[in-house]
Amino acid sequence: MTTKTSIAKALTLAAGLSLASMQAFAGADAALYGPSAPKGSTFVRLYNATSAPAAASVGNTQIKQVGAQASSDFSFLPGGDYTAQVGGKSVPVKLASDKYYTLVNSNSGSPKLIEEPPFKNKQKALVRVQNLSDQQLTLKTADGKTEVVKPVAANGRGEREINPVKVNLALYQGDKKVGDVKPVALERGEAAVLYVTGSGNALSPVWVTRPVASN
C-alpha cells in the first residue's frame, strides 16, 4: 500500500466518523428537545392553576394532562385562529407566528391566554411576574429590603434580568408582605415566570418553568 493510498483511506475513515458523530449528536438533540418547529410556528403551553389535574387542546393539538399547579412544556403549531379547550371550558384564541403563549386554567371563568415574550440573553436569568390577581404586587427579597421586580398592576406583567442566583422572595403590597414565594434557582439563559392567581387574601404564586422533558 502506497503512502498516498494510506492517507486517502485515513481521510475517508475520518470523514465517516465525523458524519457518524454529527448524526449521533443530532439524535441526542432530538431526544432531549423534541422535533424542531417549522418556520412561522407559534408556541403554547398549559399552566394549570387549579387543585385538580387538567389537559388541554388548541385546535387539533393536544396538550397532555398536568397536575395541580403544574405546567407543560411548549407545543408548536401553525399561527392562526383556534379554539382552546381545558376540561369543559373553551375560549377562542389568536396565535401569532413566532410568539410564545401560556394558556392558564384557573377556577375563575374561562381559560386565559397570556403572551410570553421570549428571553434570549444567555448571560443573565429572567424573573417575570404575570400578575393575574386583582391587586398591584411587587416582588422583593423575602426581607423586603430589595425590590426585584417593580410594582406590577393587576392583570399586568413585569420582569427583570438578574444574575443567576438562588434567592428567597416574597410578594408585597407596598411595605406589607402578602405572601412568601417558594425558592427558585435562577439559571443563566433561563426565564422563571411567577404566575399569581387568586384575589384578596387568597393569592397563589407559582413558578412556571420549562420541565426537563418536553411533551
Curated annotation (Swiss-Prot):
It is found in: Periplasm. Disulfide bonds: none annotated. This is Alginate biosynthesis protein AlgF. Its main location: periplasm. Together with AlgI and AlgJ, forms an inner membrane complex which probably interacts with the alginate polymerization-transport complex and adds acetyl groups at the O-2 and O-3 positions of mannuronate residues. Acetylation of alginate is important for the architecture of biofilms and increases the ability of alginate to act as a defense barrier. Pfam families: AlgF. Residues 1-26 form the signal peptide. One of its GO terms (cellular component) is periplasmic space. It comes from Pseudomonas putida (strain ATCC 47054 / DSM 6125 / CFBP 8728 / NCIMB 11950 / KT2440). InterPro entries: AlgF. The keyword Signal applies.
